[in-house]
C-alpha cells in the first residue's frame, strides 16, 4: 500500500468525479484499514437529498467548508454515517461512504454506512476532521481502479432518480458483516 495521504486537491474537484475515484482507495481509521467499495454523492442546495438543500445550518456547516473534511452525522436515532466534503469551499457537497472491504485487522465486507461506522467506532467526535493531515483518520491512494456501476441512491425519499450511487463490480465479493456479526 502507498502510504501517501490523498491531498486536499483530490477533494477540490466535482463530486461525481471524486465519488467514482474514491472506489478502490484505502480508508484508514485508528487500527482499521479497508478499500472503499461503495459511495453516494450529494451535491449542493439543488439536490433535495443533500443535507444542505435547506441551507446553511450548524449541522451542515462542514459541507460548506474546506474539502477533505469528514462530515459525520446521526440517523434514525441509532447510526452514524461518514461523508467526505468535496468541491470548492462555500459549495455544499459530500460523498457518503457506503461500503468498505476491511483489510485490517481482519478481512470482511462492511456493507451499509451505519454498519461501517458502527464496526469502526466512527461517531460524532469524528465530525469535522481534516482527512488530509492525520495518519490515524485519512484516505490513501491504493492504485486500484475497479470497474463500477452507477445506480440510483438508496435509503432516501427525495432525489432517488439521480444515478449517484457508485458501486464496485469486483470488490464486494466477500460475505457482508452485519450488526450481529462479532469480530
Swiss-Prot record:
GO terms for molecular function: alkylbase DNA N-glycosylase activity; DNA binding. Keywords: DNA damage, DNA repair, Hydrolase. This is Putative 3-methyladenine DNA glycosylase. The keyword Cell inner membrane does not apply. Belongs to the DNA glycosylase MPG family. NCBIfam families: 3mg, PRK00802.1-4. GO terms for biological process: base-excision repair. Its EC number is 3.2.2.-. SUPFAM superfamilies: FMT C-terminal domain-like. Pfam families: Pur_DNA_glyco.
